[in-house]
């Protein structure tokens, strides 16, 4: 009787399989990290483009209407929200995407960033404190309404006039939105040195972490969401950094950019 030698099937041992899986994990991680970074960069680029389009739309609105629009409220479905007198109901709210025709929007009518968070918008509500501006005809520049969001107020007051009462020698049109590099001093930032101290509008995205609670993000991000006239724009930092986590993307409109656009459209002389 002939006995056949059993055939030995060669295969991976458990140890060898474990080693292969570990190596595969390292390779996969090395591939995913650049992919994640590329996606984040693409999202930021898309959001910056949305913010720039929003800024251009605001300038176009001012060219057509002689003023800036009010922010949208949480209940206005993306429509600018003035009260019956024409004054804005809020200073900071959501970008009025329905009024300005900006895309993309969500189901509530809010313009959104690449992370589907609503774009925020603030506008100066400053009103010339002196009432009558020197040299203006009776009935002009005396309305007790915000200068930059009220019909014809920018044109009525004009860009060349100065306050007739203290503070003297400052423009009668004097927007008050400010942007700082942060609340915490760093090698890159001295908080007292403002990036701009007279913006007419600020538009910003709350970034990838925009859906988190205030307790989960940095102080500068919390301050932006609660701001009326002072906002923060700086280099992005991770959680645990000296200045705190920050990934907001912020743009603004200088009054001189607004004036130039309105002059070109014949809305300002």
Label each region the model flagged:
Residues 1-8:
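N-terminal secretory signal peptides that target proteins for export/translocation
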Residues 8-39:
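N-terminal single-pass transmembrane signal-anchor helix
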Residues 37-269:
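N-terminal pilin/flagellin-like segments and related low-complexity appendage regions
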